[in-house]
Amino acid sequence: TLQGQKDVIELLKEEGLRDKIKVMVGGAPATQAWADKIGADCYAENASEAVAKAKELLA
């Protein structure tokens, strides 16, 4: 869920892990604007795009 995505980022911040873990969000209700709002590192519209963006994040 969108709230779950936001919660994960908040928990990572609380545990001091946010700068060590990349977060990609997606799914039907998610958008780039949502990813920006919650502080995600990346947004992908679909699985194929997620693979390409994951490779970019890890490069």
UniProtKB/Swiss-Prot annotation:
Protein's GO biological process: methanogenesis
Source organism, top-level taxon: Archaea
Protein keywords: Cobalt, Methanogenesis
Pathways involved: One-carbon metabolism; methanogenesis from dimethylamine
Domain (B12-binding) ranges: 1-59
Example GO molecular function: cobalamin binding
Xref: InterPro entries: Cobalamin-bd (IPR006158), Cobalamin-bd_sf (IPR036724)
Task performed by this protein: Acts as a methyl group carrier between MtbB and MtbA.
Family the entry assigns: Belongs to the methylamine corrinoid protein family.
Name by which UniProt lists this protein: Dimethylamine corrinoid protein
